[in-house]
Amino acid sequence: MAREKAASRKKKERKNILNGIAHIRSTFNNTIVTITDASGNAISWSSAGSQGFKGSRKSTPFAAQVAAEIAAKKAMEHGVQNIEVYVKGPGSGREAALRALQAAGFNITVIKDVTPIPHNGCRPPKRRRV
């Protein structure tokens, strides 16, 4: 006997949020763009991996640009117009994602680098020998 679906997904309602915060997390392997409201609740997100890039292609600036465009498009459907941008991490997709958010038509009010820098905390991983 085939069972019916337990619970159907609730339709996403359109949130009317004017001001948002874009968090760009750019690592050496991937770039994740999350757009939240002022209290930190996620409105939309996207990453290079979720857009179909695999392996070393995830770490390219083009993949970061595509991820930022998709996240921006989803956020604009919820009415976001002004954003603050917080960039974190050393990856190659930082500037590309930032440029994609500007090109999407957002009014960017603040650009802030929030990369965590240790005051001589944990020992870093050993140097690669290639």
Swiss-Prot record:
It comes from the Bacteria. The keyword Ribonucleoprotein applies. The keyword RNA-binding applies. It holds the Pfam family Ribosomal_S11. Disulfide bonds: none annotated. Located on the platform of the 30S subunit, it bridges several disparate RNA helices of the 16S rRNA. Forms part of the Shine-Dalgarno cleft in the 70S ribosome. The lineage of its organism: Bacteria, Pseudomonadati, Thermodesulfobacteriota, Syntrophobacteria, Syntrophobacterales. Keywords: Ribonucleoprotein, Ribosomal protein, RNA-binding, rRNA-binding. This is Small ribosomal subunit protein uS11. One of its GO terms (cellular component) is ribonucleoprotein complex. InterPro entries: Ribosomal_uS11, Ribosomal_uS11_bac-type, Ribosomal_uS11_CS, Ribosomal_uS11_sf. It comes from Syntrophobacter fumaroxidans (strain DSM 10017 / MPOB). GO terms for biological process: translation. GO terms for molecular function: rRNA binding; structural constituent of ribosome. Belongs to the universal ribosomal protein uS11 family. Part of the 30S ribosomal subunit. Interacts with proteins S7 and S18. Binds to IF-3.
